[in-house]
Amino acid sequence: MKSRAAVAFGPGLPLEIVEIDVAPPKKGEVLVKISHTGVCHTDAYTLSGDDPEGLFPVVLGHEGAGVVVEVGEGVTSVKPGDHVIPLYTAECGECDFCTSGKTNLCVAVRETQGKGVMPDATSRFFVNGQPLYHYMGCSTFSEYTVVAEVSLAKINPQANAEQVCLLGCGVTTGIGAVHNTAKVQEGDSVAVFGLGGIGLAVVQGARQAKAGRIFAIDTNPSKFELAKQFGATDCINPNDYDKPVQQVLVEMTKWGVDHTFECIGNVNVMRSALESAHRGWGQSVIIGVAGAGKEISTRPFQLVTGRVWKGTAFGGVKGRTQLPGMVEDAMSGKIELAPFVTHTMELDKINEAFDLMHDGKSIRTVIHY
């Protein structure tokens, strides 16, 4: 099958819109026609060359929504015509991780997914006869993609695909981090470092949890209006102070903030977020992905005196069983998605979407096919 796709032929190069060949789905696989895909910082991170798992040439994209076209042998959970969201965090329901009840980090396809291939260790994408790598098990920058059955969430066909595609990554990650990882309670204080799509989703999740003070922190004050719309009570630009932002937050709260979230991927900000956490019980959740080889540091005393450092992937959400419910929440208005979509454009303009993101002019650009 022929498909239009935005292909990354090398690190740091603009994506090229080309026609590729997509092979049929094999056993346990599904062919999906993508209708919409968000452009996420993780795509830009891999494209930059900083991602230690980055492989080229590759079809990027992992925040999409579409419709099942064809299923491979043995596929029973979806059928042609079903509306789906591809998952970069699979859920097989059978591995040690899935059955533990402790994590969403399924390992069913992790090894091959990290190598940019399907579970049988081969690709379904080709250009001029040469294979292309898959990306995060999704590759939503192709109009047609092949995904493992365990990496697909079946959703309500009435859902707005332009909006719910964002539940494939950023919004789910942020909201899930609040409810699943941090378990924010009513009245707790929350500080969010970085007000991109994930950070704003954390703010929204904190409001859902009925948090008390919600501190929104960013060096780009143009993000503050939307943060307030989502529920932030205090907006802080670290550049406005002549002292570290963690000192500012501790002084504003007496002992620190109950829950802090790092949504950037900057190891220095990760330290600031931890050191802003409340003495005795504060916890800091790392969501942002740092560059290859980066390490985090703090004084052990910060942990000895009761602070906890945590991390989360996909907000602790189990995609196949829990994401459909989040789609329903979006349809009912419990999760607000429309404000995240600041730009929409066709695939041909996808490089403009990356420019908008790098310039801090967008929250999410959604590509439609």
From Swiss-Prot:
Its main location: cytoplasm. The keyword Cytoplasm applies. Disulfide bonds: none annotated. It comes from the Bacteria. It is found in: Cytoplasm. One of its GO terms (molecular function) is zinc ion binding. It is an enzyme of class 1 (oxidoreductase). Keywords: Cytoplasm, Metal-binding, NAD, Oxidoreductase, Plasmid, Zinc. Its EC number is 1.1.1.284, 1.1.1.1, 1.1.1.-. Homodimer. This is S-(hydroxymethyl)glutathione dehydrogenase.
